Regions:
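Active-site neighborhoods and metal-handling regions in enzymes and metal-associated proteins
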Residues: 1-350
């Protein structure tokens, strides 16, 4: 409401699934086209597919026909927009309406004679500060990754097939959370910086990078461990030690107001002195309803950490001699005076 007052908005309408969930609570199917509308008095109208959800943080719940005889309609955007526009017919004083410029359907904008304002930047900023219910879901997703790494350490050995490992890890994550996942990623390749699983067997001497990002009720985890297929070499251990040294520094200096860009630059210089390997990517990013959110630990952005941020730190070193590299990724919550480590499980190569 404070943001609406600052932007002098009479109404906010969101169409992205993440933002509908952020405002109204339910997580709808990826193929659906719900809408949520918040007016200047704080009243929320939800337009849901087919039937009203069992629970929603909405003052009014309307529905549109997303399916006809179980067939998914292709014109859902128009159908949900028509329902909302009909509900708004009696509204007065609508002059400035906030919408997501990247995705708001023309069916909606062409039916309203108002000035439209892009609300997406403000929504992404609001999403940075995680509420307790959001943290609970992120912690649940992280618990799934803990179990996946425990299993990976049991089954990774010379000759194991990447597809078999992928299937077992996915099953372990589902059993851990007790329901279907709402997302599943990211990297499941052995002797590779990352990528989807292949019909390939792990070989002795290789390193297996697991960058895991299961989603629980819309909220993502995103952390990484590297596991040696057998005994790690001296070069692999030297690279691991250089990477592991990054985390105490992060935990010592990050607090509200700390520059994420400066942190990236410092770690980049740390890893330049590694005896083997090159650091080739970002240092990390925020996460929540989307795997990559602010803050960006990256030279391309200039942002500062804020209390309530949940973010990743993922230093890595890559070289053919390492077969093919090491990446370790922790997840943190920014508190009032520092950080809380959310991924307090082993990071060793074996």
């Amino acid at each position: 409401m404070e943001v609406m007052q600052q932007l002098e908005l009479d109404l906010v309408v969101v169409s992205q699934l993440d933002h509908v969930q952020y405002l109204a609570a339910p997580r709808f199917a990826w193929w659906s086209a719900p809408l949520a509308a918040l007016n200047s008095e704080g009243q929320l109208t939800l337009v849901a597919p087919n039937i009203a959800p069992d629970a929603a943080a909405a003052d009014k719940v309307l529905t549109y026909e997303a399916q006809w005889m179980s067939t998914i309609r292709n014109e859902q955007r128009q159908a949900s927009a028509d329902v909302l526009l009909d509900a708004l017919k009696g509204a007065t004083g609508l002059q400035r309406v906030g919408v997501e410029f990247s995705s708001c359907p023309p069916y909606l904008t062409e039916g309203m004679d108002v000035d439209f304002v892009d609300i997406e930047p403000a929504l992404f900023q609001l999403r940075r500060r995680k509420e307790q219910d959001e943290l609970a879901m992120i912690r649940r997703a992280i618990a799934a990754t803990r179990r996946m790494y425990e299993l990976a350490r049991e089954i990774v050995e010379p000759g194991v097939n990447e597809l078999d490992v992928y299937g077992q890890l996915r099953a372990a994550a589902v059993l851990e959370v007790g329901e279907m996942l709402t997302g599943f990623g990211n990297d499941f390749q052995c002797c590779s910086p990352g990528g989807p699983p292949r019909d390939r067997k792990a070989q002795a001497g290789e390193l297996y990078i697991f960058d895991l990002g299961p989603g629980y009720r819309g909220y993502f985890a995103d952390n990484c461990r590297t596991i040696a297929v057998d005994d790690p070499s001296d070069e692999q251990m030297a690279a691991w030690e250089q990477i592991a040294a990054v985390f105490p520094h992060v935990e010592r200096i990050v607090k509200p107001g700390q520059s994420a860009k400066e942190l990236y630059a410092f770690v980049f210089e740390m890893l330049k002195s590694a005896p083997i390997g090159t650091f080739t990517h970002h240092l990390g990013h925020g996460m929540g309803l989307f795997p990559h959110e602010p803050p960006h630990l990256n030279s391309k952005w200039d942002e500062c950490f804020e209390e309530g941020d949940v973010f990743t730190v993922e230093p890595g070193l890559y070289d053919e001699r390492l077969k093919a590299g090491i990446r370790i990724e922790h997840n943190y919550l920014v508190t009032g005076d520092g950080v809380e480590l959310l991924t307090d499980f082993p990071i060793g190569l074996n």
